[in-house]
């Protein structure tokens, strides 16, 4: 490599990060997470509220979000511990005077707390979400004492809902499919679960504005119509509050797609800001016809600032917003190069990217990890919106898809997001339903799988083995 080319590459100092394990490989010495961890002590997020108040929904979404931004988080659902300990018969298990059941429930809570300790203290977890009713001051005091003994921070999330229609809808969507009610009559399930709620109501002690004024918490009233926040103490708690104040449960669909095929796509070059190819323009009109056929009410459309997404959106004949955060990943010195040219001029960089595609940062460019941080405001906007179409780019779409489908950082850079295909995401109880719609306009394949040999000393043909044909 020439001296001129060498100067383009980042310095060793800029590439160093703390390895995820104790390995001594050259890559591990150069690896680094550009995103700092904002918690100096592990955090326990404690759910509070009666059954059918959306606690598990909140727990699942919050965990997905925190993992996506790079904070290792895990849900500990007490219902799962209880089902492993004893089979469910009916609501009588939850009667406040059922002493045998009370003992079992406490033992389950202690078992879950033991697993929380293992996760936060021995498995590099940063946030544990304790998903249970935790409706009594006695139970919350037990948790607070546990957290104090182990040096964990505590943040409470209480979900309060008195709207019978919302409660009934939650029971219909979630509880009818619960493992507690397999093969049970629908009406009997509803009757039993309402009686279960009554059992909890007897001893329910909500967080108190005066008695609990020293605690950190957020109260969510009637699925987000009102909030009360108290003593937010650190960055993670602040981000949690911000996130929870943006999510909603209104039925909607999120449409994700890439721009139409571009001129640089045809030439096998990454990045750049070229316009659409002839087939790309054909796709733009096919997309317009598809969106019209969906009959979507109040559709909001977002694009990046790049020509190829704007040209794709123009064909829709709808208003659209340009979001700079949706711009494609910055390939730095590799912008508008083919994979063959990157291998020729920067073989070491090409290998390092294959070794850790999520954290690798292009010289003078970005990593997928950087891109996730850039896209966080987009996620907040998507959570706030109802029906929305996002016309973006391959790396950007992978990051957004990883959030909605709860994919790991290892899976994220290899998610398949082909050209001329729309992904329709419909949020459901604890996840997303995905429909893939190919609009029948041919395009080049831009998906490159991870090659078998990722060593720096590999032969060029091994490095280029998985490069797709661009014709």
UniProtKB/Swiss-Prot annotation:
InterPro entries: 6Pfruct_kin, 6Phosfructo_kin, His_Pase_superF_clade-1, His_PPase_superfam, P-loop_NTPase, PG/BPGM_mutase_AS. Residues 251-471 are annotated as: Fructose-2,6-bisphosphatase. The modification Phosphoserine is found at residues 33, 141. One of its GO terms (biological process) is fructose metabolic process. ATP binds at residues 49-57, 170-175, 350-353, 394-398, 430. Residues 2-250 are annotated as: 6-phosphofructo-2-kinase. Its EC number is 2.7.1.105, 3.1.3.46. One of its GO terms (cellular component) is 6-phosphofructo-2-kinase/fructose-2,6-biphosphatase complex. Beta-D-fructose 2,6-bisphosphate binds at residues 258, 265, 271, 308, 339, 353, 357, 368, 394, 398. The keyword Transferase applies. Gene3D superfamilies: P-loop containing nucleotide triphosphate hydrolases (3.40.50.300), Phosphoglycerate mutase-like (3.40.50.1240). One of its GO terms (molecular function) is ATP binding. Keywords: Acetylation, ATP-binding, Hydrolase, Kinase, Multifunctional enzyme, Nucleotide-binding, Phosphoprotein, Transferase. This is 6-phosphofructo-2-kinase/fructose-2,6-bisphosphatase 1. It comes from Bos taurus.
């Amino acid at each position: 490599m020439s001296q001129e080319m060498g100067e383009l590459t980042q310095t060793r100092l800029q590439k160093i990060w703390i390895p995820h394990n104790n390995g001594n490989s050259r890559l591990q010495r150069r690896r680094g997470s550009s995103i700092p961890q904002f918690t100096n002590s592990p955090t326990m997020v404690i759910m509070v509220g009666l059954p059918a108040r959306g606690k598990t929904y909140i727990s699942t979404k919050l965990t997905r979000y925190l993992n996506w931004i790079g904070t290792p988080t895990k849900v500990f659902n007490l219902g799962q511990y209880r089902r492993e300990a004893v089979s469910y018969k009916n609501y009588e298990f939850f009667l406040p005077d059922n002493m045998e059941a009370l003992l079992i429930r406490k033992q389950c809570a202690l078992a879950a707390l033991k697993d929380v300790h293992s996760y936060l203290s021995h498995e590099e977890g940063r946030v544990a979400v304790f998903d249970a009713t935790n409706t009594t001051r006695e139970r919350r005091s037990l948790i607070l004492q546990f957290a104090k003994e182990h040096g964990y921070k505590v943040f409470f999330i209480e979900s309060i809902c008195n709207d019978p229609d919302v409660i009934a809808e939650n029971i219909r969507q979630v509880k009818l499919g619960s493992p507690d009610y397999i093969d049970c009559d629908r009406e009997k399930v509803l009757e039993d679960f309402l009686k279960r709620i009554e059992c909890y109501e007897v001893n329910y002690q909500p967080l108190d504005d005066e008695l609990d004024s020293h605690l950190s918490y957020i109260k969510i009233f009637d699925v987000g119509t009102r909030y009360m926040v108290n003593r937010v103490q650190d960055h993670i708690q602040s981000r949690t509050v911000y996130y929870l104040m943006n999510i909603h449960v209104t039925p909607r669909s999120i449409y994700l797609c890439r721009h139409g095929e571009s001129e640089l796509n045809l030439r096998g070059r990454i990045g750049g800001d070229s316009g659409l190819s002839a087939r790309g323009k054909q796709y733009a009109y096919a997309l317009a016809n598809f969106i019209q056929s969906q009959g979507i009410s109040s559709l909001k459309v977002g694009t990046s600032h790049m020509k190829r997404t704007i040209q794709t959106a123009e064909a829709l004949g709808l208003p659209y917003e340009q979001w700079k955060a949706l711009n494609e990943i910055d390939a730095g010195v590799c912008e508008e190069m083919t994979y063959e040219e990157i291998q020729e001029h920067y073989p070491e960089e090409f290998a390092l990217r294959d070794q850790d595609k999520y954290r690798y940062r292009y010289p003078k460019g970005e990593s997928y990890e950087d891109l996730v941080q850039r896209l966080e405001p987009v996620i907040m906007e998507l959570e706030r919106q109802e029906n929305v179409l996002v016309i973006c780019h391959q790396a950007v779409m992978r990051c957004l898809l990883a959030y909605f489908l709860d994919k790991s950082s290892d899976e994220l850079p290899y998610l398949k997001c082909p050209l001329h295909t729309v992904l329709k995401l419909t949020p459901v109880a604890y996840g997303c339903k995905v429909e893939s719609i190919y609009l029948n306009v041919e395009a080049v394949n831009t998906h490159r799988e991870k090659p078998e040999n990722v060593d720096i000393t590999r032969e060029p043909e091994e490095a280029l083995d998985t490069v797709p044909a661009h014709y």
